[in-house]
């Protein structure tokens, strides 16, 4: 960094708010980045020659004067001055702030500067917004510099490296240390660094609760890697409600407290939509407090949904832990019809694989020669619904489609962190499935399961009360196609039958594109209400709820009981099928209408949307320039340059006396690790989902575990609460207990009611991880004899020390994972964090036998540079 100084001079009489703003920016530069800008008089400046910022009132300037007369000029000249003294990182941050000032609000900007001659027209409130952004982005430089720096990946595979799947390579690249220098095997524990944390306004409440409940305040490891979106319940129609105001206030408080760079507030985007379109990158590890976090697999991020406490700990530390999971491979071949998009394809996969079977607790890796025909929008829908398959997540192997999509982003900061891995040809998969895309047709998943899939032609003329096009699953290309279907129907004079119709795009940028294309008008003419961007009917807990007994056709991702509203019935399909069915309010084959749409027109509209994503702010304001923008030569897709993960390995470090207190000092679980739990059984069946355990309608009004428990299984098992209170404190369930959403409120509700243990044939991945995270004992037993004996009301004895469960005179062994045991001994992750601080994952991993601490921070870190090694001193990863 070169040495230098910057001087500031005020000329004439500027408004006080402008002077205060400029001086505030000067203080921010000094306080955050140590850059001193000295305020001098004109006479003093004549004696020296540093880079100078001369601010003047508009009426005090002469033609050709170098004085700065506008916000645009101030930020531009400040960047020039900083560039002169070698502060390139700060220049990049301020240029980004300037760009946000010029960008319209429906594109995520402030819309303060329309052109270079705007002057100091911004009022105090707008200038405060700019000041906050400058502070946030400069603070982000500090956060990035102090955060863990991942070793650079290798340009080629080295000898003696085990073959790995795509997910394994991403985890290995992010691991602090591996159990073996050759790589990782299924089931091995890793402490890993995360790239992004994402949350909704609703899950943020649970995240904060996990900290506040133990007397700690939430914190972030990087203020530029926390994506918080208001989408689940907030809506302009409910902004006046006290609980909604609390949620909005919670987001605003987080933005201010953490100096967040990536908080767009309420109803700008559904959590996943713009995050995947504009933030997630290939090779990243993303953690989110929402089960559809897996959507980012569309751009080859390993994106995994977890519970609120888990995600809060990752947000505070920049770390988390995983056991290396199995993967299954879905190999695409063939080419789909032009109108077959991602929703039809994932429904076809659900039809073939079924829920919670082959994909359960595994990662689904998508690839094959047919993948090149799938856009990133199609991949979004496919990955989004991998959670409905029961998978941990889904991820596409990055290819030319991925590379072009990421390269088309306008901001380099959101495409410069991409790392392109591909699975090894000899990688091991639990199963491989072939999907011929040419066989995919329009499907519908009938209530109440996403895998109850049949061709649309088998359900023709089913009467409907409502048609919904929306939710994150419904991408931009789906909305465009649905509008074209409606347009054809309107042109043919199709009448609109009585019924409810609603369309909710996934983000304001998509709304803006549809508006300029004239497609919002088409939806309006076809009778579709257009409320604000939100999850809407897909969640059924905000302003939009389906009525009791109503039969809906929806393009959302879930059709569980009570999902769209208490007592409602939902079937899911593509947006095109919903659009075709909305005229008669009966399920309709969309092909007659689709056949009237020129595929070339559809592609032209998608190309325009692509161009607007990468357009400069000025071009976005003038739809007339779109035709010019669209004349750009579309670059030919190119394959990315693939790399190999760096393998960090350090031999296990023996515990020393000055290391954090061992878990061995905490030998008792919340249920009594050395004691025996004696209770009675309450038996449930297979596939008990989190919507059933704690219905969404009760989450907002139940801030404590006890209040959540008062509504546990209220809709499906009204006697459950009284039975648990009467002493039936052990839940015995079947397959995939806790499937559905990531809501941590489900195990919290059980624990708050008084449930001591849940035993099941299997747990859904997120729910199964949430149990020990909140300190609730969970046991997997697959022996059918146990379930024959464990009926409601039967006495049961659980001996954690002996790892046995006894019922009806028979004893059944069980295995408890070491990490789960470590968490339960601490009564959950939040309590462990309170005791161990930001070293919580290092300490927890250190207590898992034979894991070597999942990566100690002592000794030396080996950083890969090209093909050579250089040794640098270790830095703290806390």
From Swiss-Prot:
Pathway(s) annotated for this protein in UniProt: Antifungal biosynthesis
Listed SUPFAM superfamilies: Aconitase iron-sulfur domain, LeuD/IlvD-like
Region (Disordered): 626-671
GO biological process, one term: proteinogenic amino acid biosynthetic process
Biotechnology: Due to their effectiveness as antifungal agents, echinocandin derivatives can be used for the treatment of human invasive candidiasis.
Binding positions for substrate per the UniProt entry: 173, 290-292, 558, 563, 742-743
EC number annotated for this UniProt entry: 4.2.1.-
UniProt signal peptide: none
Binding residues for [4Fe-4S] cluster: 472, 535, 538
Pfam families per UniProt: Aconitase (PF00330), Aconitase_C (PF00694)
MF (Gene Ontology): iron-sulfur cluster binding; lyase activity; metal ion binding
Keywords of this entry: Iron, Iron-sulfur, Lyase, Metal-binding
Cross-referenced InterPro entries: Acnase/IPM_dHydase_lsu_aba_1/3 (IPR015931), Acoase/IPM_deHydtase_lsu_aba (IPR001030), Aconitase/3IPM_dehydase_swvl (IPR015928), Aconitase_4Fe-4S_BS (IPR018136), Aconitase_4Fe-4S_dom (IPR036008), AconitaseA/IPMdHydase_ssu_swvl (IPR000573), IPM_dehydratase_rel_enz (IPR050067), IPMI_Swivel (IPR033940)
Job description of the protein: Aconitase; part of the gene cluster that mediates the de novo generation of L-homotyrosine from acetyl-CoA and 4-hydroxyphenyl-pyruvate. L-homotyrosine is a building block of echinocandin B, a fungal lipidated cyclic hexapeptide that acts as an antifungal agent. This is followed by isomerization of 2-(4-hydroxy-benzyl)-malate to 3-(4-hydroxybenzyl)-malate by htyD.
Stated family: Belongs to the aconitase/IPM isomerase family.
Protein name: Aconitase htyD
Source species: Aspergillus rugulosus
């Amino acid at each position: 960094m070169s040495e230098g100084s910057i001087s500031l001079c005020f000329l004439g009489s500027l408004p006080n708010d402008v002077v205060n703003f400029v001086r505030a920016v000067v203080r921010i530069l000094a306080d955050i980045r140590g850059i001193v800008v000295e305020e001098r008089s004109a006479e003093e400046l004549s004696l020296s020659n540093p880079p100078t910022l001369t601010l003047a009132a508009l009426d005090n300037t002469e033609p050709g004067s170098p004085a700065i007369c506008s916000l645009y000029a101030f930020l531009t000249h400040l960047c020039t001055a900083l560039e002169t003294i070698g502060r390139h990182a700060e220049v990049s941050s301020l240029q980004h702030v300037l760009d946000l000032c010029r960008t319209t609000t429906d594109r995520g900007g402030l819309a303060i500067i329309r052109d270079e001659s705007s002057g100091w027209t911004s009022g105090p409130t707008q200038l405060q917004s700019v000041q906050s952004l400058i502070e946030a982005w400069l603070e982000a430089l500090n956060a990035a510099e102090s955060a863990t720096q991942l070793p650079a990946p290798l340009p080629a595979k080295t000898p003696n490296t085990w073959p790995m799947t795509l997910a394994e390579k991403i985890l290995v690249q992010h691991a602090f240390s591996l159990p073996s220098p050759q790589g990782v095997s299924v089931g091995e524990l890793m402490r890993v660094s995360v790239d992004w944390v994402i949350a909704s306004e609703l899950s943020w409440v649970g995240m904060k609760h996990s900290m506040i409940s133990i007397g700690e305040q939430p914190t972030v490891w990087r203020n530029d890697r926390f994506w918080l979106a208001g989408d689940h319940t907030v809506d302009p129609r409910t902004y006046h409600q006290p609980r909604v105001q609390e949620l909005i206030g919670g987001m605003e408080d987080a933005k201010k407290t953490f100096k967040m760079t990536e908080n767009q507030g309420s109803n700008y985007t559904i959590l996943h939509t713009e995050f995947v379109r504009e933030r997630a990158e290939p090779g990243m590890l993303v953690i989110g407090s929402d089960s559809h976090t897996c959507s980012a697999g569309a751009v080859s991020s390993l994106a995994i949904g977890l519970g609120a406490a888990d995600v809060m700990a990752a947000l505070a530390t920049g770390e988390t832990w995983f056991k290396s999971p199995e993967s299954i491979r879905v190999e695409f071949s063939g080419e789909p019809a032009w109108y077959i998009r991602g929703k039809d394809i994932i429904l076809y996969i659900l039809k073939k694989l079924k829920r919670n079977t082959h994909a359960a607790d595994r990662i689904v890796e998508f690839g094959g020669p047919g993948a090149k025909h799938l856009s990133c929008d199609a991949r979004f829908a496919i990955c989004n619904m991998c959670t409905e398959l029961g998978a941990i997540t889904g991820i596409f192997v990055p290819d030319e489609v991925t590379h072009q999509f990421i390269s088309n982003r306008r901001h380099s900061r959101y495409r410069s962190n991409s790392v392109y891995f591909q699975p090894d040809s000899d990688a091991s998969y639990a199963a491989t499935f072939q999907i011929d895309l040419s066989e995919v047709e329009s499907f519908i998943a009938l209530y109440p399961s996403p895998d109850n899939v049949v061709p649309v032609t088998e359900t023709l003329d089913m009467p409907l009360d409502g048609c919904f096009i929306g939710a994150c699953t419904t991408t931009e290309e789906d909305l465009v196609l649905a509008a074209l279907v409606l347009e054809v129907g309107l042109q043919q004079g199709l009448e609109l039958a009585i019924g409810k119709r609603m369309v909710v795009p996934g983000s304001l940028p998509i709304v803006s594109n549809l508006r300029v294309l004239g497609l919002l008008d088409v939806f309006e003419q076809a009778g579709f209400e257009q409320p604000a961007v939100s999850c809407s009917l897909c969640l059924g807990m905000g302003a939009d709820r389906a009525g009791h007994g109503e039969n809906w056709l929806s393009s959302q991702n879930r059709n569980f009981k009570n999902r769209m509203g208490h007592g409602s019935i939902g079937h899911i399909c593509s947006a095109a099928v919903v659009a075709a069915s909305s005229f008669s309010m009966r399920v309709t084959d969309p092909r007659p209408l689709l056949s009237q749409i020129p595929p070339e027109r559809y592609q032209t509209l998608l190309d325009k949307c692509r161009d607007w994503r990468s357009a400069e702010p000025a071009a976005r304001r003038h739809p007339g320039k779109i035709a010019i923008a669209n004349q750009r030569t579309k670059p030919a897709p190119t394959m990315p340059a693939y790399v190999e993960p760096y393998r960090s390995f350090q031999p296990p470090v023996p515990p020393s006396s000055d290391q954090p207190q061992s878990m061995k000092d905490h030998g008792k679980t919340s249920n009594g690790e050395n004691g025996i739990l004696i209770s009675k059984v309450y038996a449930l069946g297979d596939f008990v989902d989190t919507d059933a355990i704690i219905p969404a309608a009760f989450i907002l009004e139940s801030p404590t575990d006890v209040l959540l428990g008062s509504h546990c299984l209220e809709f499906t098992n009204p006697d459950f609460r009284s039975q648990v209170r009467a002493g039936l404190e052990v839940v015995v369930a079947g397959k995939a207990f806790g499937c559905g959403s990531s809501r941590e409120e489900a195990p919290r509700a059980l624990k708050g009611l008084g449930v001591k243990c849940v035993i099941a044939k299997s747990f859904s991945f997120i729910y199964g991880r949430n149990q020990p995270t909140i300190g609730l004992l969970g046991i997997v037993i697959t022996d059918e004899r146990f379930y024959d004996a464990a009926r409601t009301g039967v006495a049961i004895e659980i001996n954690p020390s002996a790892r046995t469960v006894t019922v009806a005179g028979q004893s059944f062994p069980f295995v408890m994972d070491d990490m789960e045991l470590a968490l339960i001994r601490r009564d959950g992750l939040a309590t462990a964090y309170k005791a161990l601080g930001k070293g919580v994952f290092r300490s927890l991993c250190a207590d898992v036998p034979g894991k070597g601490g999942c990566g100690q921070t002592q000794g030396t870190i080996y950083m890969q540079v090209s093909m050579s090694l250089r040794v640098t001193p270790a830095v703290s990863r806390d």
